[in-house]
């Protein structure tokens, strides 16, 4: 027991001191800061190989989009549409991820705190207008639609099979909400060693502070956080309006 405690304290002290215990070399993406300063990331140049990249637009369904304030909803959809237009111009694979349930919600366990409330709401039921993707960012021929039953894009779907079959190794993703589908998908994809980019101004959350903390403090450890303008520049999109 004492040995376990000593090891635990040792690892804790190393973590707090910023010491690297994972054997990375000098080109690691994290620098140990001088005393009294905040750790900073060293981001590589943001580049995209269209043949190896997929764009994931997640949970842009009417029932979800309509929960956002109008002053957020309109600009968000406009930016999302611009991103998709640029991605199609650059011939990137676009994948829509949607959350839908059968009538009566047989997929929802009452112990699932996130989804159990849906049974009373009537939202996101297959075949209803609310479960459809917003017409302003509707899929086009060649796009793929993946249906999920839980928060993340990988859980309960065949997304991983699709990505592997297309030899996709980089994901550019955005969605609603930041603390829901985006967070869940980033965590899962990072653990599977995908290269990740998050388009920050095409994500939204009902709590702006949660959105800010995730974008500024959490996601940069596992993904490159970019704006829609930076993404379009990286893919060489021209005359996108």
Per-range role (PLM):
Residues 8-18:
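Bacterial N-terminal signal peptides
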Residues 22-54, 82-90, 114-241:
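Active-site-adjacent betaalpha module
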Residues 60, 99-101, 201:
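Active-site loop/turn elements of alpha/beta-hydrolase fold enzymes
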Residues 62-66:
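Short acidic, Gly/Ser-rich segments with clustered Asp/Glu that frequently serve as metal-coordination loops
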Residues 68-87:
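…and closely analogous acidic/polar surface helices at protein-protein or active-site interfaces
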Residues 86-107:
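Von Willebrand factor
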Residues 107-114:
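Short, flexible, mixed-charge acidic loops at enzyme active sites
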């Amino acid at each position: 027991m004492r040995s376990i405690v000593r090891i635990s304290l040792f690892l804790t002290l190393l973590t707090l001191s910023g010491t690297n215990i994972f054997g990375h070399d000098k080109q690691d993406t994290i620098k140990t800061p001088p005393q009294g300063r905040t750790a900073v990331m060293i981001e590589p140049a943001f580049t995209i190989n269209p043949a190896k990249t997929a764009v994931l637009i997640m949970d842009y369904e009417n029932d979800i989009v309509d929960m956002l304030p109008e002053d957020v909803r309109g600009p968000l959809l406009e930016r999302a549409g611009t991103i998709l237009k640029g991605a199609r111009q650059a011939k990137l694979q676009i994948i829509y991820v949607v959350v839908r349930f059968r009538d009566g919600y047989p997929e929802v366990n009452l112990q699932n705190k996130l989804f159990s409330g849906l049974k009373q709401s009537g939202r996101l039921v297959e075949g209803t207008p609310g479960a459809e993707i917003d017409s302003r960012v509707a899929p086009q021929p060649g796009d793929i639609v993946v249906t999920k039953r839980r928060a993340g894009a990988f859980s309960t779907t065949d997304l991983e099979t699709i990505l592997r079959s297309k030899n996709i190794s980089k994901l550019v993703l955005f969605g609603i909400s930041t603390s829901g589908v985006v967070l869940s998908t980033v965590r899962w994809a990072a653990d599977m060693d995908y290269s990740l980019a998050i388009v920050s101004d095409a994500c939204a959350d009902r709590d702006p502070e949660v959105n800010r903390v995730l974008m500024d403090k959490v996601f940069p450890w596992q993904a490159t956080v970019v704006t829609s303008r930076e993404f379009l520049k990286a893919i060489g999109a021209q005359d996108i309006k």
